Amino acid sequence: MASSSCLKQGSVPMNNVCVTPEATYEAVVADPRLFMTSLERLHSLLGTKFMVPIIGGRDLDLHKLFVEVTSRGGINKILNERRWKEVTATFVFPPTATNASYVLRKYYFSLLNNYEQIYFFRSNGQIPPDSMQSPSARPCFIQGAIRPSQELQALTFTPQPKINTAEFLGGSLAGSNVVGVIDGKFESGYLVTVTIGSEQLKGVLYQLLPQNTVSYQTPQQSHGVLPNTLNISANPQGVAGGVTKRRRRRKKSEIKRRDPDHPKPNRSGYNFFFAEQHARLKPLHPGKDRDISRMIGELWNKLNEDEKLIYQGKAMEDKERYRTEMEDYREKKKNGQLISNAVPLQQRLPEQNVDMAEADLPIDEVEEDDEEGDSSGSSGESEPHDDQSIETDPELEEPSLNPSGPNLNPNPTEIVVAPKEKNGDVVMETSPLKKADEPTVAVTAEQN
């Protein structure tokens, strides 16, 4: 049977697309080859892409999908009655196809929805009631892309109110130039300043996406054309009405830390049972904490009342312990014995702030004196192997430490050994780090 088409470029309603079915509904159901031939020709006339989908490594049987859907009254009736699972159950998919139900529905709307309208309803002289009620329910063909309006109709939502800018500003500014400036950006849109004529407005530019709708993008929308759902609102509260807020996770720094001296909360009977079973099952099932928790919950539900009393008794003892410790904790806190937010004492060595005596001795004489190895008996200087030797190099000088631990004296002093002068005397000076008015003690040792 010959077919005719009145398809034109652009968005054309279904009533303006004249497609005569090549065969009856019973004929295409009985003959899969006739079905595939007529389906390919329909997509060719409409200018839409056609290809057999592959799910789980296998070609999808479009003929079977069409028969299963139309035998139940069509896709709209199935979705309204929520019987799509019946259609999915007739197919056998591999385990890797986890979203088979969604994929089947997606391919039906893109490949078989128009075929159903022409061969199933019009062949029988039936027009879907939804198509007669509103023109928006009719499928539209936009330059080779199908808009699945039937699926959008099945998903209902409440439209958000829009602000008519011309009515808001008055009819005198309807033809004025509009200049917009983006002041800031946030997760769901932009903060903008719009100048219309002599009026300046501040608001929010955001995209309204209802939670239960499926958005479809046409090629025209991908080339800088703003969708019709973009609104300029004079009230920033419009963002909350159109965009679902995300739940913000609190940072660790925002969580109030518990007092370390606070008693450990009491545990329930299940907590004791969980700790006991977790220690037993963890070596048997490494890396499966979630499964272990599920198994422990099942084991707890299988316990009788007498077995649970054992753990509930432990819980009562722990509750009494918590009550006693809390009373003691409150009493200490009341008397001021607890130091909250206590930190360990930070100790560090004092900074080096010493006055080095300058040596007038030439370099040659210093080297000669070093070779002689002269030392004074009163200074206690001995061989370098002795632990009590005094180094003469000021760069290797370190502060003296208390043998029993760090020196906590707030005004420590340091022993400074100056290089040998011409007369061979050793000058030892003690200079305070903080108090400048204390006397300086000098010890002079004459050379033997």
From Swiss-Prot:
Keywords: DNA-binding, Nucleus, Transcription, Transcription regulation. Residues 29-120 form the ARID domain. Residues 399-412 have a biased composition (Low complexity). The keyword Secreted does not apply. The keyword Cytoplasm does not apply. InterPro entries: ARID_dom (IPR001606), ARID_dom_sf (IPR036431), ARID_HMGB9-like (IPR045303), HMG_box_dom (IPR009071), HMG_box_dom_sf (IPR036910). Residues 263-330 bind DNA. It is found in: Nucleus. Residues 389-398 have a biased composition (Acidic residues). Pfam families: ARID, HMG_box. This is High mobility group B protein 15. It comes from Arabidopsis thaliana (Mouse-ear cress).
